[in-house]
Amino acid sequence: MKEQFLKDVKGQPYLPRWFSSIFKMIQSPNAGSLIIQLPDNRKFIVESKKAGANGYIVVKNENFFSRLVREGQNGFSESYMDGWWDTPDLQAVLDFFLLAGDGIYDDLIGTNVVRLYAVSYTHLTLPTKA
């Protein structure tokens, strides 16, 4: 039996926060494919007509996508180290994103907004000399 992969988030209930937005952002990779397996075992795929790396991400923590929005590339790598996602082939996942197109994380507007908030908050709450 051939495994079923979802290519769209329409009609899919109870998706992790920010998954839909991130999935839409990576819909047109330059090459290769990426399968994202959610904690509830649903599998979504994005693929290009061009050959390339075929990545597979197993999401273990549904807050992974929120972390991507907040922290961008750092959130992606640190969440891997924290065990929030796994893969049978890390090199293929990295190659997919390398070939996916320039600035894939640049579209994460929330990353810049959250960074601005964090810096502002830090400066506003610094202890002052009395």
Show the residue positions of the predicted features.
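Conserved small/polar residues in nucleotide/adenosyl-binding loops
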Residues: 122-128
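A generic structural signal for short, non-catalytic loop/turn and secondary-structure boundary residues
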Residues: 27-29, 48-52
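Short amphipathic beta-strand/extended segments with alternating polar/hydrophobic composition
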Residues: 44-50, 58
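Accessory substrate-recognition/RNA-binding modules or partner subunits associated with SAM-dependent
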Residues: 53-117
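Acidic, aliphatic-rich amphipathic alpha-helical segments
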Residues: 1-33
